Amino acid sequence: MKSGRGDESPLAAGGPARHVPVLREEVVAALDCKKGGFYLDATFGAGGYTRALLAEPETHVLAIDRDPEAIAAGRALEAESAGRLILAHGRFSTLADIAAAEGIPAFDGIVFDIGVSSMQLDQPERGFSFRGEGPLDMRMESRGPSAADLVNTADEQRLADIFYYFGEERASRRIARAIVTDRAHTPFTTTRQLAELIARVNPGKPGDIHPATRVFQALRIAVNEELLELVRALAAAEALLREGGRLVVVTFHSLEDRIVKQFLAARSGRGQAVSRPLPGEPALAPPTFILPGKQPVLPSPEEIAVNPRARSAKLRFGLRTAAPARGLESGLLPLATLPETSHPKSASHSKSRRR
């Protein structure tokens, strides 16, 4: 579980292991846990959803996380579970390999809680937050280029595209130009250094979100390839769910939600023509998911009052049919990657590929 996403306001909790899992009851209801079922928590985080699943009668849980600190913190819970919990380190795009290594062929339910966790935001040394002083890192695992590497080496065009497409930042060109100018004299090494530059060149208006919010989101997504990971993970989850199994996904911003919404729409047949194909035309693939109830499910005002970070959360879920899994949804790849061609100004960037 990667609980409590949204803005960076304080969380009403007593430490990392007690971070509030967003939409906890709604997630459990959507999973419709059955006695003795096998479930996958694809984003363990502080373990909130895993704890909720283990509270159900005789359930078994495989929980994974790409952050080794989250796995290390969860070992005590694993030891207390009497063999009902298995923790594994890895990206959720590789969940098929992880499940195979653990000898689990299929699941009754899979839950994703997408994005950065409160644990990561609340540790300045991880470099995710602009609220404190920390290294400009943002990696969910220690390998690969950091945010500082990206900020200090990418050209102005690429930085502007990252900020616009992954952060929906309309001042992307102005911010990118300022970064390239400043780094020629002093490389960026800390979160505060970058946040102060952004606030200087794009101060925003009173009452707006912090000026650095969208840029930090964009860098985090780029560093961790979060949207591409999500596209791959949804296809992997489809293949691992047995008939009647539930796929439940909680998102915290429009880029994630759009991918999940379009995946479930495509796999459920929503929006497809209902008429029979003409002779010679390929038949429509049978739906792999049924979408029950009204969606998305949103947090209640009461939950938002207790945990303000929940306010941007959306829950979508699907019920797996007996139809064969279709594999990677190639139509979602443009939503998860930068375009091949860029536009000269952020104000003229086309949003057509995001619709």
Swiss-Prot record:
Carries keyword S-adenosyl-L-methionine?
yes
Q: What start and end residues bound the annotated signal peptide?
A: none
Which Pfam families does this UniProt record tie to the protein? Methyltransf_5
Region spans: Disordered: 332-355
Q: Can the keyword S-adenosyl-L-methionine be found in this entry's annotation?
A: yes
Q: Which GO terms describe its cellular component?
A: cytoplasm
Q: Quote the record's binding site residues for S-adenosyl-L-methionine.
A: G47, G48, Y49, D65, F92, D113, Q120
Q: Provide ranges: composition bias, Basic residues.
A: 346-355
Q: Which family does it belong to?
A: Belongs to the methyltransferase superfamily. RsmH family.
Q: Which PANTHER family match?
A: 12S RRNA N4-METHYLCYTIDINE METHYLTRANSFERASE, S-ADENOSYL-METHYLTRANSFERASE MRAW
Q: What is this protein called?
A: Ribosomal RNA small subunit methyltransferase H
